[in-house]
Amino acid sequence: MQSGNLWRALGLCLLLVGAWAQDADEQKPYEVSISGNTVELTCPREFEGEIHWKQNDEQMKGYTGKQLLLENFSEMDNSGYYQCYMTEGNKEAAHTLYLKARVCQNCMEVNLMEVATIIVVDICVTLGLLLLVYYWSKSRKAKASPMTRGAGAGGRPRGQNKGRPPPVPNPDYEPIRKGQRDLYAGLNQRGV
């Protein structure tokens, strides 16, 4: 057998042995249920006697049974280590959980599917409104009176009107006369 295959087989055997060993020690998790500002803990172990509860290593008086119901839960006061245990003689069997929960009176629980549905519906409504405005403005543009091309401000047509002479030019911008030799009458040639 080649060395590479031997190492693979040995690694596979170690993984299988580790998985079997882990199954024997695996503990069931606590069940935690939060509704409004009430928190309910369910002890995962099946004890034969009466189950007692501790919070931060202090006995909780009046709380016995598989379920612990904490009403008016406060994150500041009630967060910490919770332990369900049973005492048999002088031997104690316990199961511990650290709990830190935020609760509120008027909260609503929303799952992922509801959030996705809300987002998709929002996008569809937005696109629908966008198309509605687009087609409304397009139909409005088609109904509007057509504008003649080249019409300027005031509805005056451009170009030469045969019934009226052209406007008198502004004297400030009078063209330079050919016979006049003023300073700015022409361009001077510079010596190169």
Curated annotation (Swiss-Prot):
GO molecular function per UniProt: transmembrane signaling receptor activity
Instruction: Kindly indicate whether the keyword Glycoprotein belongs to this entry.
Output: yes
- Give the span(s) annotated as Disordered: 145-180
Q: Region annotation Proline-rich sequence: residue ranges?
A: 164-171
Q: List each copy of the ITAM domain by range.
A: 163-190
Q: Which residues lie on this side of the membrane: Cytoplasmic?
A: 136-192
Q: Which organism is it from?
A: Bos taurus
What protein name does the entry list? T-cell surface glycoprotein CD3 epsilon chain
Annotated region NUMB-binding region: where?
Answer: 160-177
